[in-house]
Amino acid sequence: MASATFSVAKPSLQGFSEFSGLRNSSALPFAKRSSSDEFVSFVSFQTSAMRSNGGYRKGVTEAKIKVAINGFGRIGRNFLRCWHGRKDSPLDVVVINDTGGVKQASHLLKYDSTLGIFDADVKPSGDSALSVDGKIIKIVSDRNPSNLPWGELGIDLVIEGTGVFVDRDGAGKHLQAGAKKVLITAPGKGDIPTYVVGVNAELYSHEDTIISNASCTTNCLAPFVKVLDQKFGIIKGTMTTTHSYTGDQRLLDASHRDLRRARAAALNIVPTSTGAAKAVALVLPNLKGKLNGIALRVPTPNVSVVDLVVQVSKKTFAEEVNAAFRDAAEKELKGILDVCDEPLVSVDFRCSDVSSTIDSSLTMVMGDDMVKVIAWYDNEWGYSQRVVDLADIVANNWK
């Protein structure tokens, strides 16, 4: 039997471009402040594209759409920070539904253990509103979406960030309350259309009243899986996401429907399920049944990393795989995919705007058809940037 060959990517080979650094939010006082105008401009161009006879044309938004945030937790607050950092946004956030009240909403938006202090003037405005750099955002509090004043406030789009109302019946309560559309910041259940920016968001139709932005892990996985499948043809594969713990876990051992997640999050590596790999088929239908995976929740508060191993139909080697990623990152996936040549660790990817960053030195090919790819992602900030992008697409295709 012939021995299998093994190749590991060497970033310095063949004149590959050097990693130019992560894009950091200006909201971070401790981060290196570099201009993200190129990123924002590119995304603005992408999200302003409208379908027209199978092609695209620049969209024009005559008026901002009114946006409500339902659930002001990790994603809700990250979304607001991301939106606040965008210039000329077609979105107007006018109300937040949060059971904690104005004082808590204001404090937790301003001071964040992961993001640091928000570089904005944030304060309560009376007993029922929040002020962010003078922008007044109303605060309401009701656990039943059907009771929310969306009709009275003229809400066009609800950012559903509770993680609870993820099916048509649940998310549909926002429509019953008078909202026109709902964007779920989690995997949707049932037949809810799922979109991943950079992968299939161009298929969005204004006729969709409830849509899903998929999960943070699917947003990381799908862009580079799309590249792998287009360039080399994926036969099958498995994925493991080493994922920071989330609010769904227990700080100390306590009851939970998942016995593993019942254990102390900061003390354990917690194996659990994830539908992220299978969900890729929702945005790349030709991969249905070809991918599966698990999650390992680890004692870090933010930033996660995907480890994908796939068998491909076209023979290849590590440098060729990385070259395909670099090409996509400079072209169709610019602002969505990045490639890193530096020997970094998880904290270095905090507040990275992109959906996934390929760790080029860890790309491997076993034999010539088994490919291993490692990709980093900020499971809160990067994901929230895509929620803003998808909301922009909704706004720029408004009729």
Curated annotation (Swiss-Prot):
Gene: GAPA2
Amino acids binding D-glyceraldehyde 3-phosphate: S215, C216, T217, T246, T274, G275, R297
UniProt keyword list: Calvin cycle, Chloroplast, NADP, Oxidoreductase, Plastid, Transit peptide
Pathway as given in its UniProt record: Carbohydrate biosynthesis; Calvin cycle
Reactions that this protein is recorded to catalyse: D-glyceraldehyde 3-phosphate + phosphate + NADP(+) = (2R)-3-phospho-glyceroyl phosphate + NADPH + H(+)
One example GO MF annotation: salicylic acid binding
PROSITE patterns named among the record's database cross-references: GAPDH
First and last residues of the transit peptide: 1-48
Single GO BP term: glucose metabolic process
Family: Belongs to the glyceraldehyde-3-phosphate dehydrogenase family.
Coiled coil start-end: none
Quaternary structure and partners: Tetramer of either four A chains (GAPDH 2) or two A and two B chains (GAPDH 1).
A GO cellular component annotation in the UniProt record: chloroplast stroma
Signal peptide: none
Protein name: Glyceraldehyde-3-phosphate dehydrogenase GAPA2, chloroplastic
